[in-house]
Design a protein with these regions (language model features):
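Intrinsic disorder/low-complexity signal
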Residues: 1-12
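AAA+ P-loop ATPase mechanoenzymes
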Residues: 17-162
Length: 162
């Protein structure tokens, strides 16, 4: 085995733990050459690229070579259960402004009340967002269904979240 540093890791996609759904988490084994620790951000590459927050895998998953992610992350990466993805640790920049667009039928309309910016900000705090991703803000629902946002566009230069 060489002393070269490994840049990425190949893992097979598995279903997320129910409590992780919608939180942008990826459960990965820590006994790997990427030196990952909880809270790190990884880029997940399948057909497309997305990002997730690293969480410790379950003990029974430690030697299986899998990454547990939810359906939103799988869709953003363009992969299905059982597909192989490549992950690598990345450094992120905080975004100052994030443009969100609710995913809904053309005839549906939604109006958000005052305070929605703070609610969204708290729900997305420290979550990695890649331009074009679909995301779910925990606790934000419409008619008891999760409200999905698409065409996400993070901006670095602006000073407020709208």
């Amino acid at each position: 085995m060489s002393n070269e540093e490994v840049d990425d890791l190949q893992l097979r996609v598995a279903k997320a733990i129910p409590s992780d759904v919608g939180h942008g988490r990826a459960r990965v084994p820590f006994d790997n050459d990427l030196n990952l620790k909880p809270g790190d951000i990884v880029e997940i590459t399948g057909e497309q690229k997305t990002a997730a927050i690293v969480w410790r895998c379950r003990p029974e998953d430690a030697n299986l070579g899998i990454i547990r992610v939810d359906g939103i992350i799988r869709k953003n990466a363009g992969v299905s259960l059982g597909d192989k993805v490549s992950i690598r640790k990345v450094e992120t920049q905080p975004c100052q402004k994030l443009i969100l667009s609710p995913v809904m039928a053309k005839q549906q309309k939604v109006r958000f009340g005052p305070g929605i910016e703070g609610f969204a900000r708290r729900g997305l705090n420290k979550r990695p967002v890649v331009s074009g991703d679909r995301i779910f803000i925990p606790g934000m629902t419409l008619f008891a269904e999760a409200l999905l946002f698409g065409k996400v566009k993070p901006l670095q230069k602006e000073s407020s979240l709208e």
